[in-house]
């Protein structure tokens, strides 16, 4: 992504890859610059005043959490949640429209944050506490998958629920979990304690691979080459989430591998999708 490559960069569904893309984008636009911060909405006015005049020293993503590290041991913590979004652009920012929680600007660029679940300033101990309550992030080089497996192998909880628990694995959302379980041939209801160490190593490696590709492409693609539309002679997927997937949001459609109708169920208030043949108990 070239610096200043155009206005209106908007985040897609905020799974972990999106936050890593945003962290890289914001470092590219603002790192090393003195920033000015305002809160047109007013809800972050005190925090914005503390940020104004500081230099953004670096950015970081941990799971679904975005961190801006500023001089003076100030860290801006953002969690987009379901409704948050960020836009940015070059030059002077436009007149504020809508509920802008935070507007950050430098001499060359601006960004607007709307609708986040969290927008707050953290001290170094609070940043450490945030990291401590999160599981390993497959996109981080410091991730320790054994720490996640220590939780999984003791749990009777369904594997899908464990993988969606951010204290077990950070950054994985419903699309990555649904698709990784399909690719591994594992039913989403499998109790965590029934997953073997080798099975976990393979599943973790696939999550790393899928999420890394998503960072590079800006969308989630999970189908292997032999199941791409051009290889199978089928129409491309049409969905606001984009990307080619096996089972996510495809209930009743034929499985790309075996032709069985994709199933849908509910787990802890979340929709799950799976193939009863490819992911048999």
Question: Would you name each region that the model predicts?
Answer:
Residues 2-281:
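Structured catalytic/nucleic-acid-binding cores of DNA maintenance enzymes
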């Amino acid at each position: 992504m070239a610096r200043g490559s155009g206005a209106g960069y908007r985040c897609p569904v905020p799974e972990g890859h999106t936050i890593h893309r945003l962290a890289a984008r914001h470092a590219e636009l603002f790192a090393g610059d003195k920033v000015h911060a305002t809160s047109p909405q007013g809800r972050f006015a005190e925090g914005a005043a503390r940020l104004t005049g500081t230099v953004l020293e670096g950015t970081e993503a941990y799971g679904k959490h975005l961190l801006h590290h500023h001089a003076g041991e100030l860290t801006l913590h953002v969690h987009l949640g379901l409704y948050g979004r960020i836009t940015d652009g070059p030059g002077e920012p436009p007149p504020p429209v809508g509920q802008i929680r935070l507007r950050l600007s430098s001499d060359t660029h601006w960004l607007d944050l709307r609708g986040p679940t969290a927008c707050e300033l953290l001290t170094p101990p609070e940043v450490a506490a945030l990291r401590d309550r999160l599981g390993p992030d497959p996109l981080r080089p410091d991730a320790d998958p054994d720490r996640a497996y220590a939780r999984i192998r003791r749990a009777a909880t369904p594997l899908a629920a464990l993988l969606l628990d951010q204290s077990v694995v950070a950054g994985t959302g419903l699309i990555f979990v649904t698709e990784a379980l399909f690719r591994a041939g594992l039913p989403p209801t499998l109790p965590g304690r029934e997953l073997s160490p080798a099975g976990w190593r393979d599943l973790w490696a696939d999550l790393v691979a899928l999420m890394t590709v998503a960072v590079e492409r800006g969308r989630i693609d999970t189908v292997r080459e032999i199941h791409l539309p051009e290889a199978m002679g089928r129409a491309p997927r049409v969905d606001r989430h984009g990307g080619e997937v096996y089972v996510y949001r495809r209930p009743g459609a034929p499985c790309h591998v075996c032709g069985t109708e994709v199933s849908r169920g509910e787990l802890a208030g979340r929709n799950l999708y799976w193939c009863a043949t490819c992911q048999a108990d």
